[in-house]
Amino acid sequence: HQDTDHVGAVESDSPGLFKEAVLYVGETENRYLTGETRRKVIYHMYKLPQVTINNEKVLLTDGQVIDIDGIKIECLLVPGHTWGHMVYLIDDKYLFTGDTIWFGADGGYSFIAALAEDNKLAVKSLAELEARLQKRNLRPMFITGHTGWTDNFEFAFAHKDKLCSPFKKRVPDPTAPYDA
């Protein structure tokens, strides 16, 4: 998604490490990059600065499967954190969740409440993601954008109906790398 902690290396004013990289982004998420939509955080009280990207873009849709050098990537829309937030299922084995799930020591929660565009939608999307994976009998490794990874399906969705609150201190998973 377009939050600068995830796309900062391709922003037009970045040092240039990825100036030639092709950016794969969901159609809805791209509206933030074009300026059509502004990102709001802290319970919609603040707008984040506009992220400007000049790279070539490939726009993605929910359920679309792409192949990059023999690697199968399935794009799954999970709106809530942002309106166009997607997760990416790689070869049916690895699920890159970005800011969809926050792992605490006792399991996964819907990502930080204060940073969501729509908290109810975020919770609903997380439950729908679980159902989509269950329907296909998939048990991927979950790789989050901030709180590590797990291969424990039940742990990943343990608190899918609850939001991670920035005002309630929760011990992070002591076994996970932690960068938040």
Model regions and ranges:
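Short secondary-structure boundary/capping segments
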Residues: 14-15, 65, 87, 133
